[in-house]
Amino acid sequence: MTRRALVSVSDKTGLVPFARRLAALGVELLSTGGTQKALAEAGVPVVGVGDYTQAPEILGGRVKTLHPRVHGGILYRRGLASDEADVKARDIPPIDLVVVNLYPFREAVAAGKPFETCVEEIDIGGPTMVRSAAKNSAHVGVVVDPADYEKVAAELEATRTLSAATRFYLMKKAFAHTAAYDAAISEYLTAREAPEAAPAHFPATLAAVYTKAYDLRYGENPHQAGAFYRAAREPEEPSVAFADVLQGKELSYNNLLDLQAALAGVMEFDETACVIIKHNTPCGVSTGRTAGEAFARARECDPVSAFGGIVALNRPVDEATASELTSLFLECVIAPGYDAAARAALAVKKNLRLLEAPRLGAARATWRRRPEEGRELRSIPGGLLVMDRDLGSVRRDDCKVMTKRAPTEQEWKDLLFAWKVVKHVKSNAIVFAKDDRTVAIGGGQTSRVESVKTAVMKAALDVRGSSVGSDAFFPFADGVEEIIKAGATAIIQPGGSMRDAEVIAAADKAGIAMVATGMRHFRH
């Protein structure tokens, strides 16, 4: 039978109605601070923990519930003779229900509060009570989520106790709650540079907090279950995870991956730009005078692959752009915004998923990345791979001309465009670019020469006079020879092959230009 409950919550959602239901069952309520005040003002009978323990709060409220009469009442094992003797000798009544959620540490961090303020929001007594109750779940219920108030109150009203199954369910949630809380603290401290020394680039222990946003219909394939988890804090750069879904069917696992690929690609550009993604790799990229023109030009690179694709635009969508978008079957569109006319035009495509990421419309120079957002995580069975995200870029001055002929001004422009795109294509990656758009893309092949051949074979536009980006060096001259055969006139690549001399000789023989970046962009 539940006779006594300790209630101390920061999130007071649903608190008073829940407490009233407990009080109506004759449950004695113990409480502290703001929770006690809220209950008393609502007319709910409540006993202050200080009165209960005969030990007033000290240290400005830092010590309130850390007392044997509290933790003894929570932790003692009912029916165990030695425990029963201990609590009887010390006059420690049982506490059968603990209702606690923790100080808003994450909210303080998200609000950009000073370090000292965030430290004061690290809860001590709360997690201790939660862990005590969860450890003794054979006898004690612990509620950390207001969403469980109805379930707990209804069961107590029906049976005056909580079943073993319910207590185990609450135990799991309690330990997940405290684990996430501690991980958030660790993550915050890891990302913060200590005053006396810079932190290690990668911490010895990696803690991160992700909360399930929703279940997915399935994972990458229908036989795989899937779910989407969201980080505790919204990034300061554009984010698929925190974008607003304005219309369409629920997002799938593959949609989310492809949207991220599209977003990462379009974030390379300050100019009005569009990226079309299919199976996590670009099939068309272009800039334009308007968003609609950028989309139309990107689609022309590979109109077959663009069907059913994912589109990212870095400018708001107007009615003219919406008209272009509705001319092709698309899965998703992400943009900084949509005007009313565009929303009306796109609404006819009821299954089209529209996402809005307002920060995508801001200047790239205004985006800031917290240290943890500059990392990329991938799991393998039994382990986690962590690396810096590939945010590398090059300018013209960073490149070294490898050939006798230097690129023309137009070729330089096309080369740097191709280099922005090729880092987002699956390796081995080849991009033909001309006049601020891709004209052919080849990727995902196990040899570089085959990626060149694939790009040329698939090209819907004329590749003659284009410039080519390669995500890694050419191991042999054959890839360059195929590029020359296709009619391209300039190449940008990392350089560094053992056979660079042969590759350069092939380029010089044909009179094309080649530059080295010294930076590789493998994507697996």
Swiss-Prot record:
What does the record give as the reaction this protein catalyses?
Answer: (6R)-10-formyltetrahydrofolate + 5-amino-1-(5-phospho-beta-D-ribosyl)imidazole-4-carboxamide = 5-formamido-1-(5-phospho-D-ribosyl)imidazole-4-carboxamide + (6S)-5,6,7,8-tetrahydrofolate; IMP + H2O = 5-formamido-1-(5-phospho-D-ribosyl)imidazole-4-carboxamide
What Gene3D superfamilies does this protein's entry cite?
3.40.140.20, Methylglyoxal synthase-like domain
Record pathway:
Purine metabolism; IMP biosynthesis via de novo pathway; 5-formamido-1-(5-phospho-D-ribosyl)imidazole-4-carboxamide from 5-amino-1-(5-phospho-D-ribosyl)imidazole-4-carboxamide (10-formyl THF route): step 1/1; Purine metabolism; IMP biosynthesis via de novo pathway; IMP from 5-formamido-1-(5-phospho-D-ribosyl)imidazole-4-carboxamide: step 1/1
Write the signal peptide boundaries.
none
Sorted alphabetically, the Gene Ontology cellular component annotations on this record are: cytosol
Output the SUPFAM superfamilies linked to this UniProt entry.
Cytidine deaminase-like, Methylglyoxal synthase-like
Q: Which domain of life is it from?
A: Bacteria
- Please name every pair of cysteines joined by a disulfide bond in this record: none
Q: Tell me the ranges covered by the MGS-like domain, including all copies.
A: 1-144
- Which family does the similarity line name? Belongs to the PurH family.
What HAMAP family does this protein's entry cite? PurH
Full protein name: Bifunctional purine biosynthesis protein PurH
Q: Which organism is it from?
A: Anaeromyxobacter dehalogenans (strain 2CP-1 / ATCC BAA-258)
